[in-house]
Amino acid sequence: MLDIKRKQDHIEINLTKNVESGLSSGFESVQFVHNALPEINYSSIDTTTTFLNKILQAPILISSMTGGTPRARDINCRLAAAAQKAGIAMGLGSMRTLLTEPSTLDTFTVRNNAPDIVLLANIGAVQLNYGVTPKQCQYLVDSVKADALILHLNVLQELTQPEGDKNWENLLPKIKEVVNYLSVPVIIKEVGFGLSKKTAKQFIDIGVKILDVAGSGGTSWSQVEAYRATNSLQNRIASSFINWGIPTLDSLKMVREASKDISVIASGGLKSGIDGAKAIRMGADIFGLAGPFLKAADVSENLVSEEIQLIIEQLKITMMCTGSRTINNLKKAELRMNHIPL
């Protein structure tokens, strides 16, 4: 029940408090060079891409948010239905509660709403140090008919959480066991503090093929935990890390330096389809957002669909104004960083 209460707290805090990182994602330092004569019909702009052997209508992921509570069930169902209509991907929130509270399964079960989407199951990697087995990870995947499993890395959040899991020793070999055991790919994802080149290489070396950089610039989970603190000392400790992390743009560059061959998801502080286009240009295969979708999904499916359409139109207009008919063209679009052409 403690896990369920924590999830309730997380939803409420994210919706009602300012929990943004004190750092920027870095994308404001990158600008596309405007193409005044693109020689393209807007109707021919093609945002489709392939991810996990499925076609996405746009390279967008609704990043992992929640699960385990009635409110989370409604949010996930609305997100999934809107993702199905738009043809984009979706990640589920941490599914640890499902292993201890089987009755929470319906808060994660969205395939009826979204039979065709790329769907990602999710659990904290550190749980492998607390008894979660590869077999249980496969159960999480099977229970929601997921296309992959996210193992998220949230060390700073755990260390600033009153009930956090603090033993991260010898975790990499256990992650490797899961990578080798599962019938679907494992995605390694940070939660808002970024992946370095060194860390990315550690995962690539054990066979991980997909990394989500989830850099700083958006939600700071240390700030979320500051609001959950049960005393002033805990609050002060968590609050002091407001400027911690690797900005998303920097993390994206680092991960791409580690490998040109893996799939990379850019998330963390992206605010629009314009930011998403910049992420694609800088090396991401798809990009993820959470905050804008959470607020919409707490209200209605229609608002989620409107938010998705906004991001897609921003992406398409950016593609048009850079002369990029396809996502592959966008990856080569002309950029300026700090007023210096790239």
Swiss-Prot record:
Give the residues the record marks as binding substrate: 6-7, 94-96, 157
| Cellular localization per UniProt | Cytoplasm
Supply the EC number(s): 5.3.3.2
Residue numbers binding Mg(2+): 158
Return one Gene Ontology term, BP aspect.
isoprenoid biosynthetic process
Q: What is its main location?
A: cytoplasm
Q: Which UniProt keywords apply?
A: Cytoplasm, Flavoprotein, FMN, Isomerase, Isoprene biosynthesis, Magnesium, Metal-binding, NADP
Against Pfam families, the record matches this protein to: FMN_dh
Please give the InterPro entries that the UniProt record associates with this protein.
Answer: Aldolase_TIM, FMN-dep_DH, IPdP_isomerase
Instruction: Identify the GO cellular component terms for this protein.
Output: cytoplasm
A GO term for molecular function = oxidoreductase activity
Which cofactors, if any, are listed as required? FMN; NADPH; Mg(2+)
**Residues annotated to bind FMN:** 63-66, 94, 122, 189, 219, 269-271, 290-291
| Catalytic reaction list | isopentenyl diphosphate = dimethylallyl diphosphate
Q: What class of enzyme is it?
A: isomerase
What job does the chain carry out?
Involved in the biosynthesis of isoprenoids. Catalyzes the 1,3-allylic rearrangement of the homoallylic substrate isopentenyl (IPP) to its allylic isomer, dimethylallyl diphosphate (DMAPP).
Q: Which family does it belong to?
A: Belongs to the IPP isomerase type 2 family.
Subunit text: Homooctamer. Dimer of tetramers.
Report the protein name in the record.
Answer: Isopentenyl-diphosphate delta-isomerase
